[in-house]
Regions:
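Long hydrophobic alpha-helical segments that form multi-pass transmembrane helix bundles
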Residues: 103-173
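Membrane-interface helix-loop-helix junctions at boundaries between adjacent transmembrane segments
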Residues: 49-57, 61, 68-129
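C-terminal ends of transmembrane helices
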Residues: 38-49, 93-105, 169-179, 219, ...
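N-terminal signal-anchor module of multipass membrane proteins
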Residues: 1-36, 275-279, 291-294
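Alpha-helical transmembrane segments and their membrane-interface exit regions
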Residues: 31-40, 86-99, 209-219, 278-284
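Hydrophobic, membrane-inserted alpha-helices
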Residues: 6-12, 62-71, 167-171, 184-193
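Predominantly late transmembrane helices and immediately cytosolic-facing juxtamembrane segments
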Residues: 96-101, 197, 206-236, 243-244
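N-terminal membrane topogenic signal
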Residues: 1-5, 115-116, 240-241
Length: 299
């Protein structure tokens, strides 16, 4: 629903304000990113026992250390760091969607027409990540974030578009064969978001209103408080029990971004620093959630 609303809002704003005006795009993107940031902070709740304070401290220290190293690496090697982030995000988002759908099948007791994960995982990841970065509006959007990223694809934008198209066709064919028509709608919705909305909004809305929501929904199955509320039929309480513990990460991320922006040695936009932190957090987040993903995918 949020994705559909974002598509409509973008189309309306593009007509009334203008597709080249980035002010409204940055505002929506920052809000969507803010919605998504807390979900990554919940990793330690499902990885380390909170009763073991020493293990928790070590975990948080290593988590922050890895994320901090990633931030510095991206700031130093903008293009290479961005390319690695694109690849990692593609894999992480694709696996995350596939894991969510498998968990949903398990909860509904669906044993037939299983998700053809091998044929859809890259499509679910590449459509929301790659397509927005190679459309006609990406140049001005990336220039607004960081001019070094404008030619991140090194001239292979058409080749990347062709690869994503092939992945999309293969995924749709596999879903038709397995009669998973609801998942085809998901792919079409993601494609519409990537094609019809500006790049900044496409990525941010996907991250905050699609990936983060699905990841949080999966966490309600493993967080004790959420699981208890779910078993009592209190779905909304179960969801919020998985969301609220991660909100300090939201404030921490923006405080860190503001600090880098104000006291940094280089002249970058606030939005660039926010994105850098979000991308950097993907590194430890992806490593930690691998165990949860393997279980969902039965690997």
């Amino acid at each position: 629903m949020a994705v559909a609303m974002a598509i409509v809002a973008s189309l309306v704003a593009s007509q009334l304000i203008g597709s080249k005006d980035l002010s409204w795009q940055v505002a929506i993107a920052l809000f969507a990113l803010a919605v998504g940031i807390p979900h990554g902070a919940l990793d330690h709740f499902v990885t380390v026992q909170r009763t073991n304070k020493k293990s928790m401290f070590v975990f948080i220290f290593v988590y922050v250390l890895v994320a901090g190293a990633a931030v510095l690496a991206i700031l130093k090697w903008n293009v290479l760091g961005f390319q690695i982030v694109v690849l990692m995000s593609l894999v992480h988002f694709g696996v995350g969607d596939s894991a969510f759908l498998n968990e949903l099948d398990r909860l509904k007791g669906i044993s037939s027409s299983r998700l053809p994960t091998a044929f859809v995982v890259l499509a679910f990841g590449s459509i929301p990540v790659v397509l927005p970065l190679i459309n006609s509006l990406s140049t001005s959007a990336l220039a607004q974030v960081n001019t070094n990223l404008v030619n991140w694809h090194q001239g292979f934008d058409e080749s990347l578009r062709a690869i994503v198209l092939v992945l999309f066709i293969v995924a749709v064919a596999a879903l038709i064969i397995t009669k998973r028509f609801r998942d085809i709608i998901d792919l079409l919705l993601l494609t519409a978001l990537a094609v019809l909305t500006p790049p900044l909004i496409a990525f941010a809305v996907y991250f905050g209103c699609w990936h983060a929501m699905r990841h949080t929904a999966r966490l309600t199955l493993v967080l004790p408080e959420s699981l208890s509320a779910y078993e009592q039929g209190k779905a909304l309480k179960a969801f919020w029990s998985a969301v609220l513990p991660g909100t300090p990460a939201l404030f921490g991320a923006f405080i860190l971004a503001a600090g880098l922006w104000i006291y940094g040695n280089v002249d970058k936009s606030f939005f660039w620093f926010v994105l850098t932190i979000v991308w950097a957090l993907t590194v430890p987040h992806m490593i930690i959630t691998a165990k949860l993903d393997r279980k969902a995918l039965r690997i």
